[in-house]
Amino acid sequence: MSFLGGLFGPVCEIDVILNDAESRKTAELKTEEGKLEKHYLFYDGESVSGKVNINVKQTSKRLEHQGIRIEFVGQIELFSDKSNTHEFVNLVKELALPGELTQNRSYDFEFMQVEKPYESYVGANVRLRYFLKVTIVRRLSDLVKEYDLIVHQLATYPDVNNSIKMEVGIEDCLHIEFEYNKSKYHLKDVIVGKIYFLLVRIKIQHMELQLIKKEMTGIGPSTTTETETVAKYEIMDGAPVKGESIPIRLFLAGYDLTPTMRDVNKKFSVRYFLNLVLVDEEDRRYFKQQEIVLWRKAPEKMRKRNFHQRYESPEPRPSLSAEQPEM
């Protein structure tokens, strides 16, 4: 995959080439438009180095400039206010002093052991991106080229990973016990559990397990929450009876998931919930939501390195909600 720059009319062409481009892995990330883009993959603490090649398009003309620089940028952009971006990382390397270009030039750059505290993310209302930015400073208008990188945040196995077990119900009508084998799952994991019916006095027609993603942006009263049902797993279709036990097995690998993100730079959060939904014969919906934590497992060869992520265990609140259908 070439690390190719863009064209700036007849003036020059800027190319950025990583030193390890041939061996470095790539990853995919969805754009705002929903298209998949492939970029080079980095982890926290890795250095970023390479060359900036500037190809002068018309060697008969001088390209005067006030300096050339490259930046490594980590940035959060809220789609509701694109004019107000927040940079949480900005490293600058000066490549050339003010002067002029009459022929092609190449400049080396290196950002040593760069801190990349968050995972790359594109959601419904927010984007967190990392990119290299080359700027040729000019009097009237700068020549700028940006190139995106993707960052993954790796984690070790959680020290504590308790199962989730609760009894919930509606008094004298429905009483069930459900259990999930863990509270924290890596992105390729399998959710294993079971549901046990202790009391059934309403006619249940359908039951499913949903994996729900909630993206929260903003602070306080200006917080916006975007909810997406990522996966649905049909547990049963028909009426259960007292004493019946139904197994659950939901494979996460086939879904587009990110790690759980909590209060990223005080701008946004991404959280995941398991939502148990029951529908009775009158189309009333009963549901119980339980938060889980998702994390990205380090590849086998990287697990000896000190990757670690703090986990916050969601606390269960044993209650079953009833949602009346619209009349």
UniProtKB/Swiss-Prot annotation:
InterPro entries: Arrestin-like_C (IPR014752), Vps26-related (IPR028934). Residues 305-327 are annotated as: Disordered. One of its GO terms (cellular component) is endosome. Keywords: Cytoplasm, Endosome, Membrane, Protein transport, Transport. One of its GO terms (biological process) is intracellular protein transport. Its main location: cytoplasm. It is found in: Cytoplasm; Endosome membrane; Early endosome. It comes from the Eukaryota. It is a peripheral membrane protein. Acts as a component of the retromer cargo-selective complex (CSC). The CSC is believed to be the core functional component of retromer or respective retromer complex variants acting to prevent missorting of selected transmembrane cargo proteins into the lysosomal degradation pathway. Retromer mediates retrograde transport of cargo proteins from endosomes to the trans-Golgi network (TGN). Belongs to the VPS26 family. Component of the heterotrimeric retromer cargo-selective complex (CSC) which is believed to associate with variable sorting nexins to form functionally distinct retromer complex variants. PANTHER family: VACUOLAR PROTEIN SORTING 26 RELATED. This is Vacuolar protein sorting-associated protein 26A. The gene is vps26a.
